Amino acid sequence: MNTLEKARILGDAGRYDSCGPKACEVKVENGLGGIYHAKAEHKTCRIFKTLMDNSCSFDCRYCSNAAGCSKNKASYEPEEVAGLFDYLVKNLAVEGLFLSSGVSGNPDKATEKMIEAVKIARTKYRFRGYVHFKVLPGTSYELVKQASELSNRMSVNIEAPNSSIMQELSGCKDYSIDILRRQRWISKLGLGGGQSTQMIINDMSTDKDVLKMSDWEYEKLDLRRVYYAAFRPVKGTPLENEKATPLTRQNRLYNSDFLMRDYGYKLKELYEIMDEGMLPREDPKLALAKATFDRPLDLNEASYEELIRVPGIGPKTAKTIILNGGVKKYEELHKLGGWVKRARPFIEINGKRQSMLGDFDVA
């Protein structure tokens, strides 16, 4: 099998790992697998996302690479993937590498090959850009440390919000030891780009389960991002007949995550709009505003913390309103980046407003 054939197989196999919200990941169709435009923090980065090896001894019931699943097997040698990546950097303007692997044999053996590949890219090919290194569950501390010295960001996929659900998904991963312990190691190593993780969203968990774990990860481990992957059944896996998770659920989890990370909302506030542990179908910020606003907020008297709780006003717009000393009319709010239609039922300007809370369709 030549390198191009491997790239198609291993690049396609790497699509299940997130390097950004799925709605912000766009695969580049160029006949070569694994190249994505990933958008994060208002910037777009072209990433080569691939596995080193798609053979795996783990038994994850949702994964096409799991032991026992039939597939086209392929693996890179370290020099091979480093050389391919160098070619992509020089010819396709790829700016970063996202490297993961199946666990063929044991985690340390697989990780050693990944480290060697990144080391070659850094030394022989003098790549100084972004590397996201996927830490495999069960990897030894010494190898995690070595990988951290070559990487900008690292991640271990927790996949589930707690150990009981993990047991339903995989019989060979110890949630506390193989996963959470590795996350603690990464946290203490202090990477410039920090660490992230991913959870699979399916019917085994509620939104309350998921957000409770995300909140813990942000608070205790100082994670930069938690990514949410709506479950998609894969043919040939034990869960192939389970129903897919609606993307609307994934999106509402992202909305709620942003509220906790960027807007200062507390987890317990989100609990207030849940029904049997599930978020409403509408935007959670809008649902919270409907539940908590008992009077309109005057834009010229409000603090930054109050402004960002108004639907249609984000952190950037709120900061601009404060810096400008307020606004005089709705058209000015629009020019500053506010979504006037959504915000207007909840606001007034200098004590004046044009509508009641129920007068507008703000969905």
PLM regions: where:
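Canonical Radical SAM [4Fe-4S] cluster-binding loop centered on the CxxxCxxC motif
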Residues: 49-79
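Long, highly charged, low-complexity intrinsically disordered interaction regions
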Residues: 238-309, 338-363
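Flexible, acidic/Gly-rich N-terminal and inter-domain linker regions that tether
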Residues: 1-58, 339-341, 347-363
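Conserved alpha-helical substructure of the radical SAM core
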Residues: 67-99
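Conserved, mostly hydrophobic/aromatic
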Residues: 47, 60, 99, 156, ...
